[in-house]
Amino acid sequence: MKVTLPEFERAGVLVVGDVMLDRYWYGPTSRISPEAPVPVVKVENIEERPGGAANVAMNIASLGATSRLVGLTGIDDAARALSQALANVNVKCDFVSVPTHPTITKLRVLSRNQQLIRLDFEEGFSGVDPQPMHERIQQALGSIGALVLSDYAKGALTSVQTMIRLAREAGVPVLIDPKGTDFERYRGATLLTPNLSEFEAVVGKCQDEAQIVERGMKLIAEFELSALLVTRSEQGMTLLQPGRPPLHMPTQAQEVYDVTGAGDTVIGVLAATLASGNTLEEACYFANAAAGVVVGKLGTSTVSPVELENAVRGRAETGFGVMSEEELKQAVAAARKRGEKVVMTNGVFDILHAGHVSYLANARKLGDRLIVAVNSDASTKRLKGETRPVNPLEQRMIVLGALEAVDWVVSFEEDTPQRLIAGILPDLLVKGGDYKPEQIAGSEEVWANGGEVLVLNFEDGCSTTNIIKKIQKDSDK
C-alpha cells in the first residue's frame, strides 16, 4: 500500500502574523580587517527570502495550496522586496502598511556556510490598530480551511483572542505557533505547536515523555485547546488530544544542517493538510516528514510535494514503513541477509492506545525488526461488527508506521493473517492476550520453518472498546 499525499490543491489557508525579510550576504574570507580583529567578507552573492509568517505562507504555497498572507510592513524597499518574492511563489499578500515603522529585516553574513553575524532592523509594531487585520481575516474566512497565527512577538498579533473568536465562529480551525510564556492569550485555539524549549518555559523542565504528556494534557485543559503538538528536535514530535492516547513520532531527519524556519514548515504543512480534509494525525505525520527534509537545507526553506512524497515513502524505499506485501517480502529477505531477527504480530489497531504502544515496544525488543500486519476495513468489519473500524485502514497504518518500535506495516484482507504469515515466515510470531500458542493464526507454518511463537501480555486497563464506550458516554452528557 502506498501512502497518498493530501489533495493540497483543494486547500486554502490564511496566515496572519509577524512577517519579515531574511537577507543573506555570502562571500569568502581570506584576511582579518586592519581596523579590528574581525574577518573581512568579500560579498559575492546576495539573497532575499521571506521569513517569519511569510515563510509559513511560502511553505503552504510550495505544496500547491492556496496561500494568503496578512501582516504588518513598513513602506520601504524591504516591503517591496518581500511582496515581490512572495508573489513569485504564488502567495497572495494583503499587507497592512505602517508608514511610521520599518519592515522587519534580518541580515545574515555567511562565509563557507558559517554564519558570522546577524543584524536586525526592527522596531516592532506596538500600538498599531489591529482592526484592518481583523477585517482582512473576516473577508477570507469563507474561502479557507485553516487559519495560522504565526507569532514572533513583533506586534502583529496583539489581538489574538479576537482573531481566534472570528475563526472559531466561522468553523475554521486555528493553528498557532506560539511565542513567549503567556499561553493565556492563545486560549481556545485548535492547535498549539510549541517546540520543547517553549513548552518547558511554560510547564517547567520535563524529565521524560510521561511528564511531557502529563503537563501537556493539563495545558490543554487549562487553556481550552483542542490539541497540542510539541516538536522535540531530534526526539521527533508528540501529539496530545483530550480523550486520545499520546502519539509520539520519531524524527525523520537524516542530516541536520540548519533548523532555521523548521517550525514554519511544520505548521505550514499541518495547516495545508488539515485544509485538504485530512485528520490531525495524518497532518502530523506529513509535517514530521517535511521537517526531516527542511532541516537538511541551509536557511529558511520550503518543501515541495515531490520532496514530501519522497520523504513519506523514503522509509518504504529503504526498507521501512508502510508497504505492500511484495515490498515487505523483499525487505524481509534483505534483513535476513544482514542476519537480523524478524518479529511479526498482527491486529486491528483501530484506536491506538498506551496498551498497544507498550505491547509493540515489547515485541520489538524480542528481535531486530518488527512487522505489524493490519486487518483491512472489510476484515475489521467482519471481526468487530458494522460500526468498526473507527479509523480507516490508511490512517491506522500511517499512525503505526510513525511509531519508533515498528519497522514495517502491511495490510491483509482475510479474516486472519495466516496466508500472509505463511508467505513471510517470521523468525518469531507474537500475539497479545490470553491465546495459547497453537491457537494463533500462522503458528503451524512458523513452527514448521523452525521459528518461534510467543504470547505477550497486554497492559491492564487498556482497551479500544472501553475507549469507544467512554467517548460515547462523554458525548451523551
From Swiss-Prot:
Q: Which GO terms describe its biological process?
A: ADP-L-glycero-beta-D-manno-heptose biosynthetic process
Question: Mind telling me which InterPro entries this protein's record contains?
Answer: Bifunc_HldE, Carboh/pur_kinase_PfkB_CS, Cyt_trans-like, PfkB_dom, RfaE_dom_I, RfaE_dom_II, Ribokinase-like, Rossmann-like_a/b/a_fold
Q: Where do the record's region annotations for Ribokinase lie?
A: 1-318
Q: Which reaction(s) are listed as its catalytic activity?
A: D-glycero-beta-D-manno-heptose 7-phosphate + ATP = D-glycero-beta-D-manno-heptose 1,7-bisphosphate + ADP + H(+); D-glycero-beta-D-manno-heptose 1-phosphate + ATP + H(+) = ADP-D-glycero-beta-D-manno-heptose + diphosphate
| EC number assigned by the record | 2.7.1.167, 2.7.7.70
State the source organism's domain of life. Answer: Bacteria
The UniProt entry annotates the active site at 264
For this UniProt record, the keywords arranged alphabetically read as follows: ATP-binding, Carbohydrate metabolism, Kinase, Multifunctional enzyme, Nucleotide-binding, Nucleotidyltransferase, Transferase
Task: State a GO cellular component annotated for this protein.
Answer: cytosol
Give any GO molecular function from the UniProt entry: heptose-1-phosphate adenylyltransferase activity
- The ranges of region (Cytidylyltransferase) come to 344-477
Pathway-wise, it operates in: Nucleotide-sugar biosynthesis; ADP-L-glycero-beta-D-manno-heptose biosynthesis; ADP-L-glycero-beta-D-manno-heptose from D-glycero-beta-D-manno-heptose 7-phosphate: step 1/4; Nucleotide-sugar biosynthesis; ADP-L-glycero-beta-D-manno-heptose biosynthesis; ADP-L-glycero-beta-D-manno-heptose from D-glycero-beta-D-manno-heptose 7-phosphate: step 3/4
- UniProt binding sites for ATP: 195-198
Describe the function of this protein.
Catalyzes the ADP transfer from ATP to D-glycero-beta-D-manno-heptose 1-phosphate, yielding ADP-D-glycero-beta-D-manno-heptose.
NCBIfam families xrefs: cyt_tran_rel, PRK11316.1, rfaE_dom_I, rfaE_dom_II
What is its quaternary makeup? Answer: Homodimer.
Homology family: In the N-terminal section; belongs to the carbohydrate kinase PfkB family. In the C-terminal section; belongs to the cytidylyltransferase family.
Name of this protein: Bifunctional protein HldE
